[in-house]
Amino acid sequence: MYLIPTVIEQTNRGERAYDIYSRLLKDRIVFLGSPIDDQVANSIVSQLLFLAAEDPDKDISLYINSPGGSITAGLAIYDTMQFIKPDVSTICIGMAASMGAFLLAAGAKGKRFALPNSEIMIHQPLGGAQGQATEIEIAAKRILFLRDKLNRILSENTGQPIEVIERDTDRDNFMTAQKAMEYGIIDRVLTRADEK
């Protein structure tokens, strides 16, 4: 069983205990450290909305260490990042793959970072279908539609031509932090927290 660490703070009113994620939220840090599904997306979206309502002019930092996951759940996070007023800075620690890389690139321009040993991976959507031929055809059309949508957005966020994105996402495409910076997924490789 995984235990969530607790942080104890001293205040003028005494001691206060927080789970680590609540304590990070006080500093406007949201942590995405798992595969992306609807439950994870709802948690991330609610944290972003809360922080935007609390102070619409102060940046939010989204730390990403995720292998990716559900496209629709990831797009819910993406749309919220674009919808709220505060800039969302993205920082890759460990791995940002698939939808994780998509969200990394979706951070505010100039505020997308990765740590030196991070790994970033982009690829086309994965999916499967079963059932009658008509159902399989519907599923195939949908995944092609989603692939085109994700490629277009990734092209806008990286500055890469759509043809390059289509070619580079055809198979799993792993990048170092440096390569991701050259590609336009991030703006800078960080070695220390005070460089942000």
From Swiss-Prot:
Biological processes annotated in GO: protein quality control for misfolded or incompletely synthesized proteins
A Gene Ontology cellular-component term: endopeptidase Clp complex
Reactions accelerated catalytically: Hydrolysis of proteins to small peptides in the presence of ATP and magnesium. alpha-casein is the usual test substrate. In the absence of ATP, only oligopeptides shorter than five residues are hydrolyzed (such as succinyl-Leu-Tyr-|-NHMec, and Leu-Tyr-Leu-|-Tyr-Trp, in which cleavage of the -Tyr-|-Leu- and -Tyr-|-Trp bonds also occurs)
Enzyme class: hydrolase
Subcellular location, record wording: Cytoplasm
Tagged with keyword Protease: yes
Entry annotation: catalytic residues: 98, 123
CDD domains: S14_ClpP_2 (cd07017)
Keywords: Cytoplasm, Hydrolase, Protease, Serine protease
Gene Ontology terms, MF aspect: ATP-dependent peptidase activity; ATPase binding; serine-type endopeptidase activity
Chief location bin: cytoplasm
InterPro entries according to UniProt: ClpP, ClpP/crotonase-like_dom_sf, ClpP/TepA, ClpP_His_AS, ClpP_Ser_AS
Keyword Isomerase: no
Enzyme nomenclature, EC number: 3.4.21.92
Domain of life of the source: Bacteria
Similarity section: Belongs to the peptidase S14 family.
Function (record text): Cleaves peptides in various proteins in a process that requires ATP hydrolysis. Has a chymotrypsin-like activity. Plays a major role in the degradation of misfolded proteins. ClpXP is involved in the complete degradation of the Site-2 clipped anti-sigma-W factor RsiW. This results in the release of SigW and the transcription activation of the genes under the control of the sigma-W factor.
Subunit structure: Fourteen ClpP subunits assemble into 2 heptameric rings which stack back to back to give a disk-like structure with a central cavity, resembling the structure of eukaryotic proteasomes.
The protein's name: ATP-dependent Clp protease proteolytic subunit
Originating organism: Geobacillus kaustophilus (strain HTA426)
Gene symbol of the encoding locus: clpP
